Amino acid sequence: EPLVQPLYWDYPEIEAAYKLTDEFRFGTELLVAPIVDPAERSVQRAKADVWLPQGEWFDFFDGRHYTSRPAEGRRLEAWRDLDRMPVFAKPGAIVPLQMPAEGEALNSVANPRALQVVVFPGAENSFTLWEDDGAAQSKDRWASTEMALRFEGDSAQFSIASAEGATDVIPASRDWTVTFRGIAPEAMHAVRATVDGSAAAPEVAYDAETLSLTVTLRDVPTSAAIAIDFADGLAVADDPVEADAFAVLKDAQMLYMTKEHAYRAIRELGKDALPALSTLEDLHGVGAQTKYQSHMPQPVIQALAEVLTRN
């Protein structure tokens, strides 16, 4: 199958799959909505119109959780700053990425010695990584590595099987960095890793900004099987609405007093603050005192609407 596919291939009966022509599937795990319009100066972000098919979705880069409840899916505006684009992962998505290893050239086309695998919670899934030597035409010159996310009761396990096939086309050992994105931090207190059934000592870290738990295992033979177990499972992280709304307002080019009023309303009302944000537009002030003016740019409201209505 092609790596890039239009949405209407999977959703031929849904009108939105035809309407948003810039959005596409990327592989089996991701939806991508490129930003093709200029940024709005007032919010210092640009937006893409997005259609999310029915179900649960995660922002690939920061792990924020989105819910699309209607059978016809959901349309929204996704606002991002200069170094980001809207990319959404399905529940259970498994996405391998190349990482530069020490001593490796950044532009090397060899199969990497270091890999990052980004994994999302919410559903069981499996993914097979296929690698060749860059010249092979026959299947017998490919190596395959099976990865799987499984749940049993309250526990979860992510596994990386030993490589099979033409293993001479891949490194003899690898550094694995497995990033579980969009999960609650409590998972890091009950993580255990094994290599071929023997206990390993992984490096474990949690990044609150991207809601990501990272487990790193170094110099693991590609002939070995890895298992990462979570006794308490992989719970989806709480939605950091207040922190994300604060970030939008902090960057916005608008009157400071209006920022304070908007943030106070969001802290007190949550998503119910959205209808009130437009009422903060008052360029007349009180009498002749312009210091009481309030200006609430529409793009700022739109960016806040995304944050407030993700779920």
Identify the residue ranges that each predicted region occupies:
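Beta-rich accessory regions
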Residues: G103-N311
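Catalytic core of carbohydrate-active enzymes
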Residues: E1-A190
